[in-house]
Amino acid sequence: MPRSAILVIDAQIGPMGGAYEGSSVIKAINKTISKVRESSGVVVLIQHCHSSYEPLMKGNTGWGLHPDLDKSPEALVVEKESSDSFYETPLDDLMAENDVEHVYITGI
């Protein structure tokens, strides 16, 4: 049966640090995550991992997902090294494996 998915892109400490009304943005993202989960949808958290830009280098504080973001245990996490969430990531395969037909996109 086709499912929906929400892609939460770059909702990380680094990019969110200076975001205008960042806490309101996270609350809105969490509300949408909850609705997708209630309909048995797939939650995908996408993290930017930069090899030379220190705030987003894997393991650095800025790389971590925002502390207020709903990071439920069943959420799938995809790491990306470019601005394109599908380029050289398993995202396309994850969408197919989970029979995703409708995609909602949010993030920073």
Task: Tell what function each PLM region has.
Residues 73-108:
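Internal catalytic-core helix/loop-beta-alpha segment
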